[in-house]
């Protein structure tokens, strides 16, 4: 099933709902600058195991509305809450990749984890993508600023270059094209605005508010959200488990899709 959920008067969020009668529900939040399509290789398999898989395009991306305006973590987490309320989701698993992981953490803190029974973080862009005083683990802020400038001046080239950074394993040219076209669905202004958000915002104060079992999966070759970020998350979130993905970069949802699906299913039960 596919439908739109209104989160503001002129802003609709696209939802893909696979196996609505599944015994347990997983709400997937995609990373920057992708869409729900990033989870294609989860949606191929997890419904066979009895799970309901809901993919949500964040505002500005995929098939959702692309308004001018705020793309901060609070606004994006509030969109998630409206989707949860509209679909009347309870006792569901929240799964976020990259920036979607950061939004998931903000949702847990800002909305007290409403409805969430377990949390899965995949290559999460948290607690901070960029380096800060007393936090040397991220990338330099200037690196993200260059991405923003490229987004606003030659977005297609930026996305081609991003694909090279995104994956550790070899990708066929058709798959690279799929990644490229998926990213191009976003608006240039939302692509840049979200990059500003993960450059400037941090989630250190949110981590202690995560009160549910949490599975952290992260590629050890990740060049975008470096692996030490996952180690900080593991140290800071109570009742969390870290599983390194030894043959993945940032694209672990594809690069080690079988392992990811297996670990996620075991975690959910």
Please provide the spans of the model-predicted regions:
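Alpha/beta-hydrolase fold catalytic core
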Residues: 1-27, 48-51, 85, 90, ...
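Conserved HGGG/HGGXW glycine-rich cap/lid loop of the alpha/beta-hydrolase fold
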Residues: 14-69
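Conserved acidic catalytic loop of the alpha/beta-hydrolase fold
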Residues: 75-92
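Flexible "cap/lid" loop of the alpha/beta hydrolase fold
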Residues: 105-110, 114-153
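Conserved alpha/beta-hydrolase catalytic His-Asp/Glu region
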Residues: 130, 134-139, 149-208
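Short beta-strand/loop motif that positions the catalytic acidic residue
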Residues: 210, 216-218
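Acidic catalytic loop of the alpha/beta-hydrolase fold
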Residues: 221-225
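Catalytic active-site module of serine/aspartate enzymes centered on a nucleophile-bearing elbow/loop
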Residues: 240-269
């Amino acid at each position: 099933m596919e439908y739109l959920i209104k989160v503001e008067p002129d802003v609709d969020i696209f939802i893909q709902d696979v196996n609505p009668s599944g015994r347990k529900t997983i709400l997937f939040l995609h990373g920057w600058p992708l869409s729900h399509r990033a989870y294609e290789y989860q949606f191929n398999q997890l419904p066979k195991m009895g799970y309901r898989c809901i993919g949500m395009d964040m505002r500005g991306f995929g098939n959702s509305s692309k308004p001018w305006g705020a793309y901060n973590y609070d606004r994006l987490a509030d969109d998630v809450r409206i989707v949860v309320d509209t679909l009347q989701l309870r006792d569901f698993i929240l799964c976020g990749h990259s920036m979607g992981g950061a939004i998931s953490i903000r949702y847990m803190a800002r909305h007290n984890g409403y409805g969430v029974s377990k949390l899965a973080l995949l290559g999460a862009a948290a607690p901070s993508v960029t380096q800060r005083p007393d936090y040397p683990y991220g990338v330099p802020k200037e690196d993200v600023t260059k991405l923003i400038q490229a987004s606003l001046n030659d977005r297609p080239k930026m996305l081609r270059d991003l694909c090279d950074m995104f994956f550790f394993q070899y990708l066929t040219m058709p798959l690279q094209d799929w990644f490229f076209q998926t990213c191009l669905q976003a608006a240039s202004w939302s692509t840049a605005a979200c990059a500003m958000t993960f450059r400037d915002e941090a989630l250190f104060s949110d981590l202690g508010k995560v009160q549910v079992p949490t599975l952290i999966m992260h590629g050890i070759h990740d060049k975008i959200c470096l692996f030490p970020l996952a180690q900080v998350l593991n140290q800071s979130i109570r009742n969390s488990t870290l599983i390194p993905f030894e043959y993945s970069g940032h694209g672990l949802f594809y690069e080690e899709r079988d392992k990811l699906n297996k670990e996620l299913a075991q975690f959910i039960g």
